[in-house]
Amino acid sequence: MFSINPLENLKVYISSRPPLVVFMISVSAMAIAFLTLGYFFKIKEIKSPEMAEDWNTFLLRFNDLDLCVSENETLKHLTNDTTTPESTMTSGQARASTQSPQALEDSGPVNISVSITLTLDPLKPFGGYSRNVTHLYSTILGHQIGLSGREAHEEINITFTLPTAWSSDDCALHGHCEQVVFTACMTLTASPGVFPVTVQPPHCVPDTYSNATLWYKIFTTARDANTKYAQDYNPFWCYKGAIGKVYHALNPKLTVIVPDDDRSLINLHLMHTSYFLFVMVITMFCYAVIKGRPSKLRQSNPEFCPEKVALAEA
């Protein structure tokens, strides 16, 4: 009479076939990992690996810049400017939104204005300006914000439009110049190849951003992180001035994510793979329960006697 002892067969299977047991455990762990990963792709938005840079990563590059607002710089009245970056902002944005990438390469520099946090930290010798400063202007190269290739040598003009005027009146009020924080409108003027080709952040309009009646702008020098920590770094850089820092807060809407259809397809493939692995493990487990005792082990059993089998057949 044929009888099955599942627990005994399973014990013998585990003790007699260690490699297969390890294989079953590994396959089970892989199936669970694929199942978990598939569920993760189903419920979580994943950043697209095809897009190396979006506007979040691009604007974060400016966080490493130090801007020096020197006390010795000459103020420039904006009414004397005939071609300011702010005056061409609207047309530049229109070109960027309506033309193809190839056309943009031939159309010259474009202007994009975004809101950003700007802090100005005056050093002790800094006494401020007698006129109302409403605009800060600087020019950098692409490599100063970590761009590579052809864009590393591209010139980027930066104009900060302050929401309120910045002058020495604040310094006189407190007895010294204190750190100020502005939500400024930053206008970037550069070749189209410098900017990411993803969804742009909300734009601000520099012409209507400041409520000051008299506009003055001042040129600032920029220093990147590599220059800051270089051996030839000048400790007296911006000694009689104010150091400006740019801060960009991550905007989830600017991150390029994997489309829902692609995520569903990835989840389906991972689920099918995990199901196949689970079926494989269950099959091996059933084999261990039903026929787990090796044939050699049965032949070595003292109750097994070939002579008795031969006599019984006779």
UniProtKB/Swiss-Prot annotation:
Q: Which Pfam families match?
A: TMEM219 (PF14940)
Polar residues compositional bias, start-end:
80-102
The yes or no answer to whether the keyword Magnesium is present is no
Q: Where are the transmembrane segments?
A: 21-41, 179-199, 236-258, 270-290
Say which domain of life the source belongs to.
Eukaryota
Membrane topology qualifier = Multi-pass membrane protein
Give the location in the cell.
Membrane
Q: Which GO terms describe its cellular component?
A: membrane
What are the record keywords, sorted? Membrane, Transmembrane, Transmembrane helix
Disordered: annotated segments:
78-106
Similarity-based family: Belongs to the TMEM248 family.
Protein name listed in UniProt: Transmembrane protein 248
Q: What is the lineage of its organism?
A: Eukaryota, Metazoa, Chordata, Craniata, Vertebrata
